[in-house]
Amino acid sequence: MRLETCSLLCAGLLSAVPVSAQTAAPAMPQPATQAAPDATQPPRRVPEPAYRAVVPPSPGDLTVWPRGASPQEIGKALAEHFITQQAARFSGYPMVCTWYGALEFARLTHDDALRDRLIARFEPMLPGGAEADRMPKRHHVDDSIVGVVPLEIAIVTKGLPVYDPRYLQVGTSWADRQWAPPQPEFTFPEAVVPLNNLQGLSPESRFWVDDMYMLTMLQLEAYRATGDRKYLDRDAHEMVAYLDKLQQPNGLFFHAPDVKYFWGRGDGWFAAGMAEMLRTLPADHPDRARILQGYKLMMAALLKYQGADGMWRELIDHPEAWPESSSSAMFSFALITGVKHGWLDAETYAPAARRSWIAVTGYVDQNHDVTQVCTGTGKLDSMQYYLDRKRETGNLHGQAPVLWAAVALLRDEK
């Protein structure tokens, strides 16, 4: 049997009746001879194997993806775009979050060349380096997260010839400073809670929902790099305090106690922070049950508010709001991580995770920039303020979580 006929049979387009027994069809005009392909045009898409049409991936499959949506392809494109075009000058916590995602992608894909370029870009910012003055100085949660990059470098190079102890020293100094009394000349007053009210919390605690990624990741990375339990214990204690303060009965989080709106990216920061925390927190840790409870409550809420397009909105509980890519990528990361670890029921949550990843990749343009990203946003007690936020392309607030979601799909963990 000819291969073409077999393919059509598999696809259900021909019956299995022998050709001799079929009723003869009227002769059809033969197509004209095709011209040679134009070398100036992109190659025509090669059809996928017939079995893909017959046996498509299940709704919850997290391994087989449409053309152009694989985590390897998306992750590589965004990591390369970051190091070649977006990392020229340090620009704060969105850059740190993207750097972390790119380093993790390089580690998981064994891309040593990419890893070394990411490290080389940070090296001038070490003490005494040509760009050391670009390191932030404020005692503020949005600045202290810079310590994540040297800590991640220490983690991914541990035991390798390229390991440099300076990265661990610099990273842990930021993590230690986050719990030390603030230096007045380097303090951003709005972010610092009076020390006598802290009850073991960081002086940088301000009870904005965003903090639960910024603060969480610095302490987690310090623990991952050193194994020192103090970083993990105080981090988990902090997260429980934020859960008690900001999570609502519906599972979502207010931007701040005095701003009662469920802002997409704000909730995304918390979702991603909880997923990262639960990846590391031991099963017997006294705060794990409370954090897992808060995480599951939020994931259940996200199922309710996910749009038919796979996305979440700028204000999560307002379907009339615009689909926002950075929050959707963060929720995708949190869902993927929960399904792969078994914290979430795969039958219920994996389809939502798959839809969200495919939807988010559709917002990556031909230049590898993520589109429809909410601009940097402080808190304000106004619904219209959030609905009217500027939508940006290539903003690192969006590049970073798409990298995290790609990394989550590539991780082999449960």
Region spans (language model):
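Boundary at the C-terminal end of the N-terminal hydrophobic targeting segment
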Residues: V19-T23, P29
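CBM-like carbohydrate-recognition segments
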Residues: A36-V96, F105-G147, I153-V170, F186-P189, ...
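Extended ligand-binding groove/face enriched in aromatic
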Residues: R115-D116, M125-A256, N367
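Extended ligand-binding clefts on enzyme/binding-domain cores
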Residues: V162, R166, R206-L315, A321-S332, ...
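Glutamine-centric residue-chemistry signal
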Residues: Q22, Q86, P182-Q183, Q247, ...
